[in-house]
Amino acid sequence: MPSPTHLLNNFESSSSQGPPSYCLICCEVADGHHFGAAACRACAAFFRRTVQLNKVHDCPKNGQCFILSNVRNMCRACRYEKCLEVGMQRSSVQQKRDQLGRRDGLPTNREEPVLDTMRRAYEKLLVVRKKVHNRQENQLPRAISFNELQVVYQNEMTVIYQFLCEAFPEYSELLPDTKRSLFKNFFLPFTLLESSYYGYLTKQENVMLIPSGDYVDLAHLESYFNNNHHTFSQKDTISMFAQQFRMLHTSITVPLSAENVDVNEFLALAAIILWESDLEVEADRKNVQEEAVKIKSAIIKDLLFHYQSINVYADVAMRLGAVLSILPSIQRASHRFHEYMEIKNLLNLYALPKNLYDMFSPTS
C-alpha cells in the first residue's frame, strides 16, 4: 500500500494528457506545463518570482553554470536564461497575474504565494512524521489497534502545530490562546480530510490510512479492538465504529474522488478550514477575522492561478466552486465524528485520553 509520502512525491497532474517526464530546466520530474514549457514546480515558481519582482541576476561564471536539480545553490542567472531558452514566456506570467488582480493586503513578510508556502510546509511535515512515528525506510504498512492509534494522534498534535507555524507566519504571531482555539477547531477536520484524501488517492475503501503510514483495517475491526476495556459486546462495538467510518467515506472521500482533487486543492481546503473557524478568544477576534479574510482571498487567487497554469479546466470558476462545495461536507463529518466521540465517552466505550479528546473537540 503506498504511503502518504510516496503519494505526494509521485503525485501526477490531473491533465488527461499527463505531465511531461522531465523539467526542461533542471531535469527534475516535471509536474506540468508552466508558462509555455515543461517544468517542475520549483523552476516554475522561480521563473514566476523573477518576472513578477523584475529581478536581475548576475552569473559569476559568464553564463557557463550547470543547471541540474542536484546542484546546490544553482546560479539564478543561468537558471533564468535556461527558462527562456526552453520556451517560458514572461508575458504569460504577467497576463495571468493581471487577470487575478493585485495581492494588496497580504502580510508584507510573505515572499511567495500562500499555496507555495503551504506545500513546502506540508512536504516538511511528511519528513518530520517519519521521524516522529519512527518510520523506517521501506517499512511496510500494517493494521494497528485502537491503543496504537491514540499514540499516533497524540504525536500528531506537535507535528500539525509545527506545520501551521511553517505554513502561516500569521498563525505564529497570534496570541497563545488564539492559536490554541484555531488549532482545536482545525485538528479534527484536517485529520479527517487528510485521511480521506489519501484514501481517495489509493482507492482503498476498506482501510483508514493514518499519518504514521499504517492503517485501520475496516474489514477486520476485531483486530482494532484488542483489549476488553468496554461495556458493549464486540459485535455492537464493531457495528458502531463501522458506521462511523462509513459516514467518513461517504461524506469526504467520495466527494474528493468525484472531483479528482489535487494536492493544491487539498491544501487550499485545509487552509480555509483553519481560517474559517470561530474563536473563543474575544480579545483577538477582530484582528484574526481581518487576517483570515486576506489569507482566504489569497488562497482563492492562488487556486485560480494554479488552474490557469495547468490549463485543464475550461471553466476555472466552476472548478473552484466544485472544490469549495466539499467544505460543508467536511464540517458536517467533523461534527458527526465528535458526536460519536461523546457517545463513546459517556459509555466508556474505547474513550480517548482527556488531552486527545479535548483536542478533537471544537471550541465552537
Curated annotation (Swiss-Prot):
Alphabetical GO biological process terms: regulation of transcription by RNA polymerase II
Annotated organism of origin: Caenorhabditis elegans
Lineage: superkingdom: Eukaryota
Location of this chain's protein in the cell: Nucleus
GO molecular-function term, one example from the UniProt record: zinc ion binding
Name of the protein this chain belongs to: Nuclear hormone receptor family member nhr-53
Keywords carried by this UniProt record: DNA-binding, Metal-binding, Nucleus, Receptor, Transcription, Transcription regulation, Zinc, Zinc-finger
Lineage of origin: Eukaryota, Metazoa, Ecdysozoa, Nematoda, Chromadorea
Alphabetized SUPFAM superfamilies for the sequence: Glucocorticoid receptor-like (DNA-binding domain) (SSF57716), Nuclear receptor ligand-binding domain (SSF48508)
Pfam families named among the record's database cross-references: Hormone_recep, zf-C4
Stored Gene3D superfamilies: Erythroid Transcription Factor GATA-1, subunit A, Retinoid X Receptor
Gene: nhr-53
UniProt record similarity statement: Belongs to the nuclear hormone receptor family.
